[in-house]
């Protein structure tokens, strides 16, 4: 029996670097040692990506995951030929590309909900292309949340063992500050802890970052820590959660990277993004927690400016596949 986890990998926007990085990642034999990769995309686009990148691989279009060979040298592919190859252009925002990317995601979700794949790893998509296709989502997390019926799924970054959650994401900084409430922080402490346990961590140590310089120095310059964050942390501790904070944001991520904490709850988008990407930009992986299955993703965009040149690095996608494979077994046991 093959015990390697079966990972469904979406090709991403077909006009982007997604097909090229998929080709490069699946040319790496290490990926096949870790998992059984199943690409979900378009065989015609992938054939073009093979030419562009110069990789020597065979395509094996399949109707179901059970038909895959999962051996290095052959790319098993759920084939969804929904784009017009005559009009598809590298590096351009196109409605048909946005619609195709959404179709790949939707099929990956169906396979995961059926239990046909153990986890999903996603390639890059473009928000403008989704909008052009009249698909009313701003990103992967929202799509996965809606199509799985999951309430407010969590985003977690993993960068070489450093794990970061986000209390707020795609809102203005002013709005993010207004959203830092006792109830929201407490809810996220509970849910982040549950997510870490689902990944196999036992009694995980969670640190909550502060908002203001030096955590506001007891209200001298900003009172969000005293008014909202500290009461939430104290309530969570009373409930038995292994949480501490608020910790100064200029040092808490370093302490987590050194192993003092299992994860950090950052308070707004750039607070966590800067920490992760400065630590290792290419190896930052996004994980969506709070879904019925595990989802990992590259943490970069479609890079239209270099699409079709063969220059795009597959490091982030390879790392996303590795992380998905690493956590798949533990996630399956706790589901």
UniProtKB/Swiss-Prot annotation:
Top enzyme class: oxidoreductase
Function recorded in the entry: Catalyzes the NAD-dependent oxidation and subsequent decarboxylation of D-threonate 4-phosphate to produce dihydroxyacetone phosphate (DHAP).
Record-listed substrate binding positions: 140-141, 277, 295
Enzyme Commission (EC) number: 1.1.1.408
Gene source species: Symbiobacterium thermophilum (strain DSM 24528 / JCM 14929 / IAM 14863 / T)
Annotated family: Belongs to the PdxA family. PdxA2 subfamily.
GO molecular function: metal ion binding; NAD binding; oxidoreductase activity
Pfam families: PdxA
Cofactor note: Binds 1 divalent metal cation per subunit.
Record-listed a divalent metal cation binding positions: 170, 214, 269
UniProt-recorded name of the protein: Putative D-threonate 4-phosphate dehydrogenase
